[in-house]
């Protein structure tokens, strides 16, 4: 079994308690597990937004942050973030920084699948061109951070539930990364 096929289970305090196979974890009664969200910026200060592939099990076709994922058992979070950036976007990244260390959410998608995650949020810089994996990303766009904030403020239901919650909490960080202070 590959590292990326496992999800780390955690208790209410965020302590690792074990792992489960990723293919069995997301259901109507998803246990609390560890994940991450990352907002990727280019050299012009734009943030990458992606539309999830239509074949994704959860929230297919929904616009969201740059990428998300789960660390494997024993895998450092920054290694998991770098691994997912390469897998989903075909890009190397740098300057990874945690901006919302205690973010947690629960959400249910249209099919009844529940996300139940302790999901620290990171920002990073792209170190190359995006070559999106079509099994992960249907579309993508580099946009100004101010446009992302305005879109989420105006119509939060049109983005993933985690992005709708994260963007208002990290407004200052998004603007700073985008060169707007």
For the regions a language model picked out, list residue spans one by one.
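A residue-level structural signature of the nucleotidyltransferase/glycosyltransferase Rossmann-like core
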Residues: 7, 46-47, 140-141
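Nudix hydrolase/Nudix homology domain
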Residues: 24, 61, 73, 102-181
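Residue-level structural signal for beta-strand termini and adjacent loop
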Residues: 20-22, 53, 77, 136
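A structural signal for short, well-ordered beta-strand segments
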Residues: 38, 66-67, 98, 120-122
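Detector for glycine-centered tight turns/loop "hinges" at secondary-structure junctions
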Residues: 12-15, 45, 90, 112
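The catalytic Nudix box helix
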Residues: 48-49, 66-100
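Acidic, metal-coordinating catalytic segment for phosphate/diphosphate chemistry
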Residues: 2-37, 41-43
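A glycine-rich, hydrophobic loop/mini-helix early in the fold
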Residues: 35-67
């Amino acid at each position: 079994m590959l590292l990326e096929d496992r999800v780390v289970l955690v208790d209410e305090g965020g302590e690792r308690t074990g792992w489960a196979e990723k293919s069995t974890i997301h259901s109507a009664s998803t246990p609390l597990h560890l994940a991450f969200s990352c907002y990727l910026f280019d050299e012009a200060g734009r943030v990458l937004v992606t539309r999830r592939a239509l074949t994704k099990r959860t929230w297919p076709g929904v616009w969201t942050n740059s990428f998300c994922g789960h660390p494997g058992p024993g895998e450092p979070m920054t290694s998991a973030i770098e691994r997912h950036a390469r897998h989903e976007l075909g890009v190397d990244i740098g300057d990874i920084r945690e901006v919302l260390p205690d973010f947690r959410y629960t959400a249910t998608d249209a099919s009844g699948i529940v996300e139940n995650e302790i999901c620290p949020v990171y920002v990073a810089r792209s170190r190359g061109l995006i070559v999106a994996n079509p099994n992960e990303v249907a579309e993508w766009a580099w946009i100004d951070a101010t446009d992302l904030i305005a879109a989420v403020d105006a119509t939060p239901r049109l983005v993933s539930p985690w992005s709708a919650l994260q963007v208002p909490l990290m407004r200052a960080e998004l603007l700073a990364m985008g060169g707007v202070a």
